[in-house]
Amino acid sequence: MGKKDRDSSKPRGRMSAYAYFVQDSRAEHGKNHPNSPVRFAEFSKDCSARWKALEEKGKGVFHEKSMRDKVRYDREMQSYKPPKGEKNKRRRRRKDPDAPKRNLSAFFIFSGENRAAIKSVHPNWSVGDIAKELAVRWRAMTAGEKIPFDKGAAKDKERYIKAMAEYKAKAKPMKRQVKESSSSSSSDSSSDDSSSDDSD
């Protein structure tokens, strides 16, 4: 679903305890190393290791923040009304298995690189829980931290455009052949009908 299709009035998803921990860690890094940009892959691994080593008492403050945010989210969702027609979305066209794979967005590339790390910290989380966590982390990132993923998305878009052009170029001759074959069959059928009339 594109950005234009998203409902801006929908309440922001609740943050997990770990997301608050990562947020605090990023703020701490910014204070201690103001001129050092965050290398997200390394930073994510470091946060994961520190969270695992943190005692439950230390995690308590982050769980409290998460619970308060859950209360906020539940309250906002009670008064939220989705736009009309959202439940009756258009049916997607059947995909051609030979068509090029769609290009990935920056967020999808980010998710692919960080999904396993979240799963290792929270092995019992569902796919939906992990997706929410990824979304929360993505929103918390600065524009500078997103640059590597934006570049990856731009490169993949170039790949898709090129592959799509080649795919369409191959598809045109095939459509022409099908059309010609259909016309030929139609002519043969007319010819047979005509012969039949003459014999009568």
Swiss-Prot record:
GO MF annotation terms: DNA binding
Residue spans of biased composition, Acidic residues class: 190-200
Subcellular location, principal: nucleus
Keywords, alphabetical: Chromosome, DNA-binding, Nucleus, Repeat
CC annotations in GO: chromosome; nucleus
DNA-binding region: 11-81, 100-168
Function: Binds preferentially single-stranded DNA and unwinds double-stranded DNA.
PANTHER family in alphabetical order: HIGH MOBILITY GROUP PROTEIN B3, HIGH MOBILITY GROUP PROTEIN DSP1
Family from the record: Belongs to the HMGB family.
The name this protein goes by in its record: High mobility group protein 1 homolog
